[in-house]
């Protein structure tokens, strides 16, 4: 809630059920794109958005790390990127996240086991992000980073 405001443009990488995209839309953000490697997740996310009377933009399916066309189709200039995915994927995507985030924009990544948090933080910083918050809950970590 503290990082998403009305008018923000949002990309949700690894959308799953769409919960983060839906929350962003409910906060007044313009969710432009949701991405997942599973077509069923994209369908579920769209259904959940409809049930909540919000739009979560276009759904793209595939592996953005391996599919250059998909990576290009995702676009760039997002004021907020949310990603609730495992540490290895966040580490691999950190440079892509940086490239797709608008200047002054925010990356919020979660789904990170605490024992992998230092690796994720290092990858985000190496990509050019400034980590501004590291939240922990039980075995899990989340980072907020600025470009």
Please identify what each model-predicted range represents:
Residues 130-147:
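Core SAM-dependent methyltransferase catalytic element
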Residues 85, 109-114:
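Short strand-turn motif at the edge of the Rossmann-like AdoMet-binding core
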Residues 115-127:
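Short alpha-helix
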Residues 1-64:
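Conserved SAM/SAH cofactor-binding pocket of Class I
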Residues 68-80:
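A short acidic, Gly/Pro-enriched loop at the edge of an enzyme's catalytic core
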Residues 40-44, 89, 116:
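Conserved short alpha-helix immediately C-terminal to the canonical SAM/SAH-binding motif I
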Residues 91-106:
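A short glycine-rich, Lys/Arg-flanked "PGG" loop and its adjoining helix->strand segment in the class I
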Residues 79-91:
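A short SAM/SAH-binding and catalytic strip from SAM-dependent methyltransferases
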């Amino acid at each position: 809630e503290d990082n998403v405001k009305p008018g923000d443009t949002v990309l949700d990488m690894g959308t799953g059920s769409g919960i983060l995209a839906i929350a962003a839309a409910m906060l007044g953000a313009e969710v432009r794109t949701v991405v997942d490697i599973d077509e069923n997740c994209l369908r579920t996310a769209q259904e959940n958005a409809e049930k909540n009377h919000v739009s979560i933009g276009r759904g793209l399916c595939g592996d953005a790390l391996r599919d250059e066309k998909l990576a290009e189709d995702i676009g760039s200039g997002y004021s907020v990127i949310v990603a609730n995915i495992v540490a290895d994927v966040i580490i691999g995507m950190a440079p892509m996240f940086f490239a797709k985030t608008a200047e002054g924009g925010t990356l919020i990544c979660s789904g990170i086991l605490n024992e992998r948090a230092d690796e994720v933080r290092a990858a985000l910083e190496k990509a050019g992000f400034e980590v501004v918050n590291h939240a922990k809950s039980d075995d899990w970590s989340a980072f907020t980073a600025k470009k």
